[in-house]
Amino acid sequence: MTIAVDLQGRPFHFIGIGGIGMSALAQVVTERQLPVSGSDIRRSHITDRLAQLGAQIFDRQAATNLEFFQEAVSAGQSPQVICSTAIHAHNEEYQAAIDLGCPVFHRSDLLAALLRVYESIAVAGTHGKTTTSGLIAYLLYQAGLDPTVVIGGEVNALGGNARLGQGRHLVAEADESDGSLVKLQAAIGIITNIELDHPDHYCDLEAVISTFKTFSDNCSQLIANWDCPTVRDRLPGTISYSLDPARGADYTVDQVSFRGSGTQARIWERGELLGRIHLPLLEAHNLSNALAAIAACRHLGMDFASIREGLAGFEGARRRFEFRGSAQGIQFVDDYAHHPSELAATLAAARLQIDSGCSRLPEVPKRLVAIFQPHRYSRTQAFLAEFAQSFGPADLVLISDIYAAGERNPGQLSGQTLADAIAQYQANVHYAPDLEAVEQRLHQLLQPGDLALFLGAGNLNQVIPRLLDHYACDRSAA
């Protein structure tokens, strides 16, 4: 007999509660007034927020955490233990959960249980999930529909990566990285695009498509991006959208204008003009994300005037071209891009702000400096050729060593390997092995007028505050 996640009062314990996906689930469960504890070896503003909401946070992973929590909440009722794919069977806390007889669930099991409670919208796809789900959540929130939100990135306008609403909708980001996407069922599913991005889990693109096919079958309605050939040909959906009117999709655009301050376009719905939008985000991929959000919100019955007003106020998710500050004429921006397609799109958007002379940033930059930390050995190895050709818009490139994310190096692969590959296409390429070396190298390379764009899903952005302090101190000394 399969044991289901209990949302009616049984306590929860999260192993790795500080992760961006785990913390979102923990926040919603905590706000549902259920007893929650969790462990994470890294304290952060996210774990601090959970503690303020009432969760008990342990700063190490140990068997005693579960024993203490079990005694505190109720004798004889063991907590439900939630873990992600990153938690291995040899983890001490995981083993303690098994020994104590606690039911252990993958985080996707909890998300699936929450999706069943609401009229749910689940956003899947290789790229654009966080921005699209954040947009939908923000549009519903601005319209007074008070959604519950569980997404994989922090949205300033929503106060973070999760919220418990009183409305009937739940907006969730649906992650395909470990194959658990197949467990999720939703009233509305969205597929933004399909590429091979997790070679550590999938052997080829067909395996990825199979996972998305199961997800598609589990959704009552599927909103599909027809600009992605794989989606268009294999999973066309019940509702379609495209930036190309010639494709004949249900939702499309024309009169598109990309300027430094954002994007303008006219929106069409099944051949009828809805009106013009202004989106304070750049590049075609963000307009595509907005079109997916429009399709979802229109299907839910929202009027276009409310959608247009909401889009104009959406400033994006954190670590998605996020301005972090400036000093001595150098502007620092943080972006989560870690796949060749994402890098190319983000760098193109940054280049546009320089070439157009119109920027979302406080000042129009003069030079684009791309600082990239590759994420995972498996991804770097699988897409080395694609990565090498992704940095064309940059004037200068600095590559750090690979953020392993728990993987072992399969051989002699390093950031230097990638830097050498990029150097075949780019003249001004540099390599620095670790964060300290990155910081010191940037002291030598950066100059007034630069846009220092930090790219990657690892911890590279930890350098940004130190650089801001360095240049601020230099100014004070002067």
Swiss-Prot record:
Signal peptide per UniProt: none
Keyword ATP-binding: yes
Gene3D superfamilies associated with the record: Mur ligase, C-terminal domain, Mur-like, catalytic domain, NAD(P)-binding Rossmann-like Domain
Pathway: Cell wall biogenesis; peptidoglycan biosynthesis
Binding site for ATP: 125-131
Lineage of source species: Bacteria, Bacillati, Cyanobacteriota, Cyanophyceae, Synechococcales
Organism: Synechococcus sp. (strain ATCC 27144 / PCC 6301 / SAUG 1402/1)
Domain of life: Bacteria
Family note: Belongs to the MurCDEF family.
Listed GO MF terms: ATP binding; UDP-N-acetylmuramate-L-alanine ligase activity
Keyword entries, A-Z: ATP-binding, Cell cycle, Cell division, Cell shape, Cell wall biogenesis/degradation, Cytoplasm, Ligase, Nucleotide-binding, Peptidoglycan synthesis
This protein's name: UDP-N-acetylmuramate--L-alanine ligase
Localization, UniProt: Cytoplasm
GO biological process, one term: cell wall organization
Reactions accelerated catalytically: UDP-N-acetyl-alpha-D-muramate + L-alanine + ATP = UDP-N-acetyl-alpha-D-muramoyl-L-alanine + ADP + phosphate + H(+)
One Gene Ontology cellular component: cytoplasm
EC number: 6.3.2.8
Disulfide-bonded cysteines: none
Gene name of the encoded protein: murC
Function: Cell wall formation.
